């Protein structure tokens, strides 16, 4: 039996994304003497944060009323929306669905917003630990969730303990909040253990790709938000694109493909590359360069696929609970 250190908190939050950090901030605002901890597996807050992202600002205004005075590094007011159906060589402009009007919203970077949220949480007394991944849930004698065990360090390729082995501590709390994002390892175990998905539709998932491009001068319309459906996907495959115009001749470009696609030959990343060769997109990107790129999965089932969010000793928030608003194509404000 490995001897492990034990850390104890009132509330343990697993995941340092927008949901986890907003939860920590709000808890301390409501009850300053709570002992709150946030665990983030990435080496730094924001290092693995990835989203479109268009922010509906109302919830952030309520959480941090002064955030607009010191916004994150990328924070562009939305100016105009476009929605199109792409064919192989052209595009047909469609009415923008009412849920996708972005007046009053902002194009942001989650990778820049989350460090600001973490700094705010720490200023309120929250312990934020990066580089620590939760390896297993812990349970009380009555079966309720008691916290998590941090992964062991110094394990050899063979699975044996190496010379630098350090056992991961146990982090125990009265309440554990799972904010791991889509398909988190602890979340999956607890959904199964407590049958949280017994009375909802099966969750569906999408795989999203995103790139930040630096373009030649004069092509970008800051605040323009463009979405498209259609080519290169067939009409049996769920998916589409986003193109968000930033300042300083930069754009976010991305593509999402539903992972329930039927065609075994479909490769989502290849579909993204095809999309960038569409005449309207190629003309925009030609001569530019990719500054950053990433990919992630999203929970895309919507309201009917949300599991039960609470269980004895724990609850799910953010994408761990499938809170993405699919008609709006937004989830950060829900988180």
How should each PLM-predicted stretch be described?
Residues 10-37:
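N-terminal Rossmann-like FAD-binding beta1-loop-alpha1 element of flavoenzymes
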Residues 14, 178, 316:
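Redox-cofactor binding/interface segments in oxidoreductases and associated redox assembly factors
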Residues 19, 44, 183:
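Conserved Rossmann-like nucleotide-cofactor binding loop
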Residues 41-88:
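N-terminal FAD cofactor-binding segment of flavoenzymes
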Residues 62-63, 72-74, 80, 108-109, ...:
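N-terminal Rossmann-like dinucleotide/flavin-binding domain of flavoprotein oxidoreductases
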Residues 91-112, 119, 147, 256-258:
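Helix-loop-beta segment of a Rossmann-like dinucleotide-binding subdomain
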Residues 120-283:
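Predominantly flavin-linked oxidoreductase catalytic cores and closely associated redox partners
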Residues 237, 263-264, 268-334:
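FAD/FMN-dependent oxidoreductases across multiple families
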């Amino acid at each position: 039996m490995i001897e492990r250190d034990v850390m104890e908190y009132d509330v343990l939050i697993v995941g340092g994304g927008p949901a986890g950090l907003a939860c920590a901030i709000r808890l301390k605002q409501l009850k300053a003497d709570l002992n709150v901890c946030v665990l983030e597996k990435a080496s730094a807050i924001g290092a693995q944060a990835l989203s479109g992202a268009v922010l509906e600002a109302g919830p952030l205004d309520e959480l941090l009323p002064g955030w607009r005075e010191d916004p994150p590094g990328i924070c562009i007011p939305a100016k105009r929306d476009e929605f199109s159906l792409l064919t192989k060589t052209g595009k047909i402009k469609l009415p923008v669905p009412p849920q996708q009007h972005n007046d009053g919203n902002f194009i942001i970077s989650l990778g820049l917003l989350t460090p600001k949220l973490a700094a705010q949480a720490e200023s309120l007394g929250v312990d934020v630990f990066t580089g620590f991944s939760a390896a297993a849930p812990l349970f009380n004698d009555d079966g309720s969730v008691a916290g998590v065990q941090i992964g062991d360090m110094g394990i050899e390729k063979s699975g044996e303990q190496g010379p630098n082995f350090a056992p991961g501590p146990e982090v125990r709390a009265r309440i554990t909040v799972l904010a791991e994002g889509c398909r988190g390892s602890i979340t999956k175990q607890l959904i199964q253990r407590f049958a949280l998905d017994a009375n909802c539709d099966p969750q569906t998932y999408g795989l999203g790709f995103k790139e930040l491009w630096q373009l030649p001068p004069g092509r970008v319309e800051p605040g323009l938000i463009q979405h498209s459906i259609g080519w290169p996907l067939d009409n049996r495959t769920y998916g589409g694109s986003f193109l968000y115009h930033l300042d300083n001749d930069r754009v976010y470009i991305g593509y999402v493909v539903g992972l329930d696609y039927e065609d075994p030959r479909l490769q989502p990343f290849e579909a993204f590359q095809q999309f960038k060769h569409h005449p309207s997109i190629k003309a925009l990107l030609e001569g530019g360069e990719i500054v950053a790129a990433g990919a992630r999965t999203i929970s895309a089932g919507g309201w009917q696929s949300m599991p039960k969010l609470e269980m004895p000793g724990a609850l799910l928030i953010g994408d761990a609970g499938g809170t993405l608003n699919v008609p709006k194509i937004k989830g950060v404000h829900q988180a």
